[in-house]
Each structure stands twice: as C-alpha cells, then as structure tokens.
C-alpha cells in the first residue's frame, strides 16, 4: 500500500508519493518503489496507489490518452475514465491515479470518476486521509511553504501514522 498527495499552492503544483510496496497486510516487499513519475515531456506528473501491476497498466493507458489529446490533462483523464467504466477488464483493476500539470490536479478513480479538488489538495492510498488533512492545514496556515514542501510534509505526517506508508518520499513539482 502507499500514499500519494498532490498540492496546488502559490501558483505551483506538486505531487509526492512514498515507496512502500506491501504484500498482503503483513509483509513489506520493497521500501523504495517509485510511484510518482513525470510523463509527457516532463509537463505532467502522475502518482498511483493500489495494485502495482494494475496501476502501471492504468498509468500507461493515461499516458497514451495524454499523447492522443496533445497533453490536455482533463480531456485525457475523462477519456480514460470513460474507457475504464466501459471495459469489464479495466473495471476489475484495483488502483487509483492522481495526475497533475502546472495548473490542475485530478484523481482518476477505479469507478471511472474524474475528481477535481475544491481546496487544491488531493490524496489517495492507505494514508490518504492523513496526508490530505495535513496538506489542507499546511496550505491554509503555512503560506511561505512551497507546494512541494507541503506535499512532502503531508506524506511524512501520514507515514508517522499509517503503517503502510514509509518515509522514502519522492516529490515532483511543476511550475
């Protein structure tokens, strides 16, 4: 399991993810997986939570949609969600994505939804609720922090609480 958190703050966006891969609920298989990546000529970043194979499959499909729609993040996300809803094989995938560009944060969920946040913060995964609460508070009360600093701090807070999230955090910030 893992935690991914994305933040839009002071005109920048950032996404952070930890590196823990868990087998079932008892064994940590790996602590340094990279679940946050830049794609589309480094103009978009994506983070995933859920089954690793499922998430990688969805990430590849999203990247194909992004190329098909010339980097239009919202259109690519909506098209992936429509495909996800309509394909019985995809419906069985257990993963979620957060995708960001310099202006937008979106969740693409397993039920085929595209979610835009009201408050500039999104989080998914086992520690998502903790990370989201921390990022909302930091965004509200720490105006001098960057989006990347907020996302990383939120992940560290989640890792202190959630046993399925670790402190091996990767941050990608887009300007």
Curated annotation (Swiss-Prot):
InterPro entries: ATP-dep_Prtase_HsIV_su, Ntn_hydrolases_N, Proteasome_sua/b, Proteasome_suB-type. GO terms for molecular function: metal ion binding; threonine-type endopeptidase activity. Pfam families: Proteasome. Its EC number is 3.4.25.2. Keywords: Allosteric enzyme, Cytoplasm, Hydrolase, Metal-binding, Protease, Sodium, Threonine protease. It is an enzyme of class 3 (hydrolase). Allosterically activated by HslU binding. It catalyses: ATP-dependent cleavage of peptide bonds with broad specificity. Na(+) binds at residues 159, 162, 165. The active site is at 2. CDD domains: protease_HslV. One of its GO terms (cellular component) is HslUV protease complex. GO terms for biological process: proteolysis involved in protein catabolic process. It is found in: Cytoplasm. Disulfide bonds: none annotated. A double ring-shaped homohexamer of HslV is capped on each side by a ring-shaped HslU homohexamer. The assembly of the HslU/HslV complex is dependent on binding of ATP. Protease subunit of a proteasome-like degradation complex believed to be a general protein degrading machinery. NCBIfam families: ATP_dep_HslV, PRK05456.1. Belongs to the peptidase T1B family. HslV subfamily. This is ATP-dependent protease subunit HslV. It comes from Ligilactobacillus salivarius (strain UCC118).
């Amino acid at each position: 399991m893992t935690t991914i958190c994305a933040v839009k703050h002071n005109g920048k966006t950032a996404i952070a993810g930890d590196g823990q891969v868990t087998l079932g609920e008892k064994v940590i298989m790996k602590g340094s997986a990279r679940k946050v990546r830049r794609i589309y000529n480094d103009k978009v970043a994506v983070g995933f939570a859920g089954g690793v194979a499922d998430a990688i499959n969805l990430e590849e499909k999203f990247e194909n949609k992004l190329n098909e729609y010339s980097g239009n993040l919202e259109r690519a996300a909506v098209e992936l969600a429509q495909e996800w809803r309509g394909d019985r094989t995809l419906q069985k995938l257990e993963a979620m994505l957060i995708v960001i560009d310099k202006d937008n944060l979106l969740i693409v969920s397993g039920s085929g939804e595209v979610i835009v946040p009201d408050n500039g913060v999104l989080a998914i995964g086992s520690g998502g609720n903790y990370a989201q609460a921390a990022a909302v508070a930091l965004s509200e009360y720490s105006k001098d922090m960057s989006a990347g600093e907020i996302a990383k701090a939120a992940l560290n807070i989640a890792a202190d609480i959630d046993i399925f999230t670790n402190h091996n955090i990767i941050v990608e910030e887009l300007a």
